[in-house]
């Protein structure tokens, strides 16, 4: 017996549907499309969101909100992510070098999430009150 001799057991695999290949298949003649109408024609699909000429939902509802450009150059960092930074001094550049934040980020804020395992010095990075307390409790300090 070789690999090219192997075949599935009879009846274990069903044949795929081939619409329009005879009435015995159950999908002959109309091929599962029904009789007449737009969806029976070739190319008879409608665009997503089209509601038959009625004003679509996305145009009935008012516009709202905007995309803040500030979000593009700001980032939040968890306490647990500070462990990825090598050395005792954490700056925006050291976070970029450790792939914790994107290269286009300019301002960072440290959030209280996770734990600090070692004393680190934070330079030029903002922090929440809880994160600041946790870093200082671990022996770390902040420098502006």
Curated annotation (Swiss-Prot):
TM region(s), chain numbering: none
InterPro entries cross-referenced by the UniProt entry: Ribosomal_uL15, Ribosomal_uL15/eL18, Ribosomal_uL15/eL18_sf, Ribosomal_uL15_bac-type, Ribosomal_uL15_CS
Keyword terms, alphabetized: Ribonucleoprotein, Ribosomal protein, RNA-binding, rRNA-binding
Record Gene3D superfamilies: 3.100.10.10
Record GO cellular component, one term: cytosolic large ribosomal subunit
The UniProt record lists the keyword Ribonucleoprotein: yes
PROSITE patterns found in the cross-reference section: RIBOSOMAL_L15
Single annotated GO MF: structural constituent of ribosome
Top-level division of the source organism's lineage: Bacteria
Disulfide pairings: none
Assembly and binders: Part of the 50S ribosomal subunit.
HAMAP family: Ribosomal_uL15
Family: Belongs to the universal ribosomal protein uL15 family.
Function: Binds to the 23S rRNA.
Name of protein: Large ribosomal subunit protein uL15
